[in-house]
Amino acid sequence: MLTIQFLCPLPNGLHARPAWELKEQCSQWQSEITFINHRQNAKADAKSSLALIGTGTLFNDSCSLNISGSDEEQARRVLEEYIQVRFIDSDSVQPTQAELTAHPLPRSLSRLNPDLLYGNVLASGVGVGTLTLLQSDSLDSYRAIPASAQDSTRLEHSLATLAEQLNQQLRERDGESKTILSAHLSLIQDDEFAGNIRRLMTEQHQGLGAAIISNMEQVCAKLSASASDYLRERVSDIRDISEQLLHITWPELKPRNKLVLEKPTILVAEDLTPSQFLSLDLKNLAGMILEKTGRTSHTLILARASAIPVLSGLPLDAIARYAGQPAVLDAQCGVLAINPNDAVSGYYQVAQTLADKRQKQQAQAAAQLAYSRDNKRIDIAANIGTALEAPGAFANGAEGVGLFRTEMLYMDRDSAPDEQEQFEAYQQVLLAAGDKPIIFRTMDIGGDKSIPYLNIPQEENPFLGYRAVRIYPEFAGLFRTQLRAILRAASFGNAQLMIPMVHSLDQILWVKGEIQKAIVELKRDGLRHAETITLGIMVEVPSVCYIIDHFCDEVDFFSIGSNDMTQYLYAVDRNNPRVSPLYNPITPSFLRMLQQIVTTAHQRGKWVGICGELGGESRYLPLLLGLGLDELSMSSPRIPAVKSQLRQLDSEACRELARQACECRSAQEIEALLTAFTPEEDVRPLLALENIFVDQDFSNKEQAIQFLCGNLGVNGRTEHPFELEEDVWQREEIVTTGVGFGVAIPHTKSQWIRHSSISIARLAKPIGWQSEMGEVELVIMLTLGANEGMNHVKVFSQLARKLVNKNFRQSLFAAQDAQSILTLLETELTF
C-alpha cells in the first residue's frame, strides 16, 4: 500500500465540486483508494463523491490517500501531482465581505420614516414587487407509498431520466448555472447515492419514496453536522436532487406550491433549491428573502449571477402577514420597505434612475478602446477557456481574446475531441467576436495537465517535462486535427494561432510545416478554411529571450506567459510553500527581460502582449505601460477597472518609471518606486454640464439631495455618494440652506468628494425646503474637497451676491437648457 499525505488546500472544504473531481481522478485506477480525514478520524471510498463529502473535510485538515492495487505506483504519482497542483482549482471562490456589507441607511431615506424590516445582505441590488410567500411542500405523501416489486426498475428509470434532464439543461445553460447543474449531475451519478437507496429498499424493506427520503435525510444530517458553512449549505443540493427524483417517479403527485411569477415578485421562502430558482421567470423575480440560505449556497450563487438581490435573517412569520403587499427589497442597505408610501417610492425611483445612468455609463466606457491619458493605444483582451465565456468578456470591454485555452476541450473526458467538435467550439467564439481577434493557444497538455487517454508516462517534474509543443511530433495526428479545426473556423473571423512552450527555432519551423500540410489537406477535402493565419508564440521559456530576433523572421507576434516564465527564470515552483515566496515577477531581472523582448520585437515590427496573471494586476499597470507592451490579456472581470486606470496614466511618465525600475537593485526598491508614483490626474472643472439638470420632477428636498449626490458618484467625482450625502445633511441640520427667491444652496466641505463640484437642479415644480424662506425651485449644491481651504466660502459668497440680483435670478430661471445655465454661470462667476 502507498500513501499520499497532504493538508486540505480548499478554502471551502471538500464540497461537491472538488469531491467530484477527486473521485474522477481516483476512478481512473484499478487500485482501491481510501480517503482519510485524520482530524475527523473519518474514512471514505475515494471513488465516491458523496462519501468524500461526508468526511466533513475542512481547509488545512490533515488528510491522506491510501492506494492499494496493481497500478498503485502509477496512481500515486498521478494523484500526488493532482493534489499538489490542480486540486485547489476545483474549489469555488467565496464572495468578498465588501460585497455583502449593508450600507447605513442614507438620510434621504430615513427622513421619510419608511416602514422597514432589517435583514442581512446576501446579494446586492434593489427590487420592487409584491411579497409572495412560498411554503415548503411536505414529502409525507411520497414516504407513505408502499413498496412495490417495480421499485428497483422505477429507480433506475428515474435516475436515467433526471440525468437526461440535467444534461439537456447543461447544453442550454452557461456560466454558474452550468457549473451547478454539473455538480448535481455528479451527485446522482455517484455510486453511493443510488447504492444507499437500493440498500434501504432491500435491507430495510422501505418503499422507493421512503428510501429516497431516508437517503436524503441521512446525507443531509452528515452535512448539517459539518463545521463548514459551505458544506452545511450543500444540504439544499441534496434535497433538490432528491425532490426531483420523487417528482419524476410520481409525476401525478405534483408539488402543491409550483412557482409561477406573473408580475414583479419578491419571493419569500425558508429556502429555495437551485432547480426551483432555474425554473423561475427571472423577468418577474424582483428579489428574494430566504430565511435559511447561507452565503455560499448554490441558489445564492445563481441569484448573484442573475443580478437578483437577496436578503436573509428575516423570519418567515415576521413577513407572512405582509404577503400580497407591495414592497421594496433594498439589498444595498439591508432593508425591506413594506407598503412604501409615495415619498419612499420616490426615493427608490431616484435610486433606479441613478442605477440606470451608472449602468449605461459603464457600458459605454467598457465599449471604448483602451488609451492612456496621452492617447497611447494598448489592446486589452481576455483570457478564456470556453466559447461560453466570450460574450461576457466582450460585455466587460474585452477588445479581443488574448488567450483561448484550447486544452480545456481535451480535459475531463475519455477521448480527444474530434475535428468537428473543435471546429464548432472555435467557430462559436469567432462568431461572438465579430472582427475582434481571437488568439487560440494550441493544446497545452501533458506535464502538469495529464490526459489519461494519451498514456504519457508520469514525470518527476512535470513543469519541466513533456508538454505542449514538445509532445506534438509524437501526437502529430492529434495536433493536425486541431490545426484543421482552427483553420476551418478561421474563415469565420479574426483567428490567430499561438504555440506554447516553444524554446527553439526548430520547433516553430516544424509547426509551420504542419500548418501548410493541414491547409493542403483542407483544400483536397474541399472544406472552407483560411488560406493563411497569423502565428505567434508564448514566450515562457527564458532561452527564447536571447533569440527573439531570429523568431521575428518566422512569427508575427509574441505573448509573454508571465506565470511560467517567472517560475523558469528563477527556478522556483510557485506551488512549493518553501520557495513560493521567491515567486515574484516584479524584480529588476524580470523587468529587464521584458524590456529586452519588447525592444527587440518592436525594432523588427512585431507586437508583444502579456497573458499571465501579471497582465491584470492594477498595481503594476504603470510598469507594463512604461515597458511598451502592446497588449494586456487578463480575466475579463478585471478589464473595466484596468481600462479606467489606464485612462489616468501618462505613457511618458510610465516609461520613465519603467526605466528607473530596471535600474533598481531589488524588488523592494521597485515596490518603493511604485508606492511613490502618483499619476497626474486631470483637473475637472467646478462647473460641468454633467452636473446641471433642468425640469427635474422631485417631490421633496430629500430626493433633490439624493439625486445630486448620487449623480456625482455616477460621474466619478466621488466614490462615496452616501457618505457625501451624509455630510450635506449634517451641514443642513445646522441651519437650513434655503436662501430665498426660490433658491437653496446646500453645501459641504467633505473628505468624500474627489473633484470639487457645483451641481444644479432647476425643478419642474416648487418643493418644500423646511425653511422660513419658502419653497424652492432651484437647487445649487456645493461639494468642495476637505483641502480646499476657504475656497468654499468664496464660492458661496459669490453665488449669494449674484442671487440677490433680480436679473441674474431671472436669467437662471429662464435659461432654456443645461448648456444655457452653464454658459451664464461661467460668464458671471469666477473661481
From Swiss-Prot:
A GO cellular component annotation in the UniProt record: membrane
Active site (catalytic residues): H15 (pros-phosphohistidine intermediate), H298 (tele-phosphohistidine intermediate), C611 (proton donor), H747 (tele-phosphohistidine intermediate)
Region (PTS EI): 119-650
SUPFAM superfamilies noted in UniProt: Enzyme I of the PEP:sugar phosphotransferase system HPr-binding (sub)domain (SSF47831), HPr-like (SSF55594), Phoshotransferase/anion transport protein (SSF55804), Phosphoenolpyruvate/pyruvate domain (SSF51621), Phosphohistidine domain (SSF52009)
GO MF annotation terms: kinase activity; metal ion binding; phosphoenolpyruvate-protein phosphotransferase activity; protein-N(PI)-phosphohistidine-sugar phosphotransferase activity
Pfam family, one: PEP-utilizers
Keyword Kinase appears in the UniProt entry: yes
Protein's cellular compartments: Cytoplasm
Cofactor annotation: Mg(2+)
All copies of domain PTS EIIA type-2, residue ranges: 685-828
Residue intervals of the HPr domain: 1-90
EC number(s) stated in the UniProt entry for this protein: 2.7.3.9, 2.7.1.202
UniProt: phosphoenolpyruvate binding residues: R405, R441, N563, D564, R574
Record GO biological process: N-acetylglucosamine transport; phosphoenolpyruvate-dependent sugar phosphotransferase system
UniProt main location, coarse: cytoplasm
Reaction catalysed by this enzyme: L-histidyl-[protein] + phosphoenolpyruvate = N(pros)-phospho-L-histidyl-[protein] + pyruvate; D-fructose(out) + N(pros)-phospho-L-histidyl-[protein] = D-fructose 1-phosphate(in) + L-histidyl-[protein]
CDD domains named among the record's database cross-references: PTS-HPr_like, PTS_IIA_fru
Keyword terms, alphabetized: Cytoplasm, Kinase, Magnesium, Metal-binding, Phosphoprotein, Phosphotransferase system, Sugar transport, Transferase, Transport
Modification Phosphohistidine occurs at: H15, H298, H747
Binding annotation for Mg(2+): E540, D564
Free-text function comment from the UniProt entry: Multifunctional protein that includes general (non sugar-specific) and sugar-specific components of the phosphoenolpyruvate-dependent sugar phosphotransferase system (sugar PTS). This major carbohydrate active transport system catalyzes the phosphorylation of incoming sugar substrates concomitantly with their translocation across the cell membrane. The enzyme II FryABC PTS system is involved in fructose transport.
Similarity field: Belongs to the PEP-utilizing enzyme family.
Entry text on domains: The PTS EIIA type-2 domain is phosphorylated by phospho-HPr on a histidyl residue. Then, it transfers the phosphoryl group to the PTS EIIB type-2 domain. In contrast to classical PTS systems, the fructose-like PTS has no requirement for HPr and Enzyme I; FryA combines a IIA domain with an Enzyme I and a HPr domains.
The protein, known as: Multiphosphoryl transfer protein 1
GN (gene name): fryA
